[in-house]
Amino acid sequence: MAAPTLARLVLTHLLVALFGMGSWAAINGIWVELPVVVKDLPEGWSLPSYLSVLVALGNLGLLVVTLWRRLAPGKGERAPIQVVQALSVVGTALLAPLWQHLTVMAGQVHSVAFLALTFVLALACCASNVTYLPFLSRLPPPFLRSFFLGQGLSALLPCVLALGQGVGRLECPPAPANGTPGPPLDFPERFSASAFFGALTALLVISAAAFQGLLLLLPSLVSIPTEGSGTGLRGGAPGVEEEEEEEASPLQEPPSQAAGNTPSPDPAAHRLLSARGACLLGLLATTSALTNGVLPAVQSYSSLPYGRLAYHLAVVLGSASNPLACFLAMGILCRSLAGLGGLSLLGTLFGAYLMALAILSPCPPLVGTSAGMVLVVVLWALCLGVFSYVKVATSSLLHGGGPPALLAAGVAIQVGSLLGAVTMFPPTSIYRVFQSRKDCVDPCEP
């Protein structure tokens, strides 16, 4: 087979990146739009905790994909990917007209439409973890790095939309003689949340079109069954075997214990993972619990006391730190377990300070000062950026273990996210451990 031209390779990398962009764009878009929608939805400051639980429950999508593989073994990933993309496009498109629709349940008003559609999108995004990567596992490692770059874009592009939308500003009216101020005056955003969800739908349509373009450029991928097809396109790519061997060596047992051809998906294949690989899986689960469950649940409590501007910037810049960490990992990849552990400890220290701010809400340190606002925004960006780098580096190292390692990595991510979200739901939504701060009211005055 003739070597592909440079133009074809560049186009393939672009399509792979756009394909990866659609993996978590829907949920990331909802997170960065929270500063806007939280003003109109009855859940208020508890909404991030609700969303964390819904995203964790989206792990049911993994069960659906597993059932598909049992009922249709060897059929490949094309149909599940198309279903995932269809759910993402339709769910996001329905958010545009329905996100403000409210329903009375048990005597209380809830944003049932918004939460239900978020759950559908969570199902699709969680299922993408176990459908997209197996489809691309037959490609050489450079294409997989383009895919991870695309996953970074799934956070960056919604952030760009949010920045273009503008920060929700408000003006506090002068306090009258009796000392009771009137309601705050909100300034409208440049465009509505409905328009934001419409633009997000367009991004998901582009991602789905990129997948169809991949099927046209790489027709051999469609006919290769999922089971036992680990070699795929790798054999014809110069230098790929050497690179994969280099990436696999930190995680695999000695060659005498891993002498098989391609890893099989049965449980015995997990013996390919070494003790170091198990430590990496634990690190991946821990960072996922913090970034996908614990920290998002308290982001509003830690940043909103410093103002809506601080909250919006913390959400947007925190999400934008993800693709920046991906860029860094593409150039500088930490392969040391001690180094990754040290970075995780640094991120944990940042997260502990942010958790302390949430506990001390509505009167955390430096509230009402520019220094406090800058500090909380910078710490959110650094904390999520450090954890994102650790997750990317850990996943890259685990990729060397083959399909069993990728499966274990996906399970670790989802289990960690679930545990983090479930842990934070009672203190935020049931016991009300964290206290919110009302606009234009200063509860910190002596």
UniProtKB/Swiss-Prot annotation:
Superkingdom assignment: Eukaryota
Catalysed reaction equations from the record: riboflavin(in) = riboflavin(out)
Transmembrane regions: 14-34, 47-67, 79-99, 104-124, 147-167, 196-216, 278-298, 313-333, 340-360, 367-387, 405-425
Region feature (Disordered): 228-267
UniProt biased composition (Gly residues): 229-238
InterPro entries in alphabetical order: Riboflavin_transptr
Keyword Acyltransferase attached: no
Record's compositionally biased regions (Polar residues): 254-263
The keyword Lyase is assigned to this record: no
Description of activity control: Riboflavin transport is Na(+)-independent but moderately pH-sensitive. Activity is strongly inhibited by riboflavin analogs, such as lumiflavin. Weakly inhibited by flavin adenine dinucleotide (FAD) and flavin mononucleotide (FMN).
Identification of the protein by name: Solute carrier family 52, riboflavin transporter, member 2
Gene encoding the protein: SLC52A2
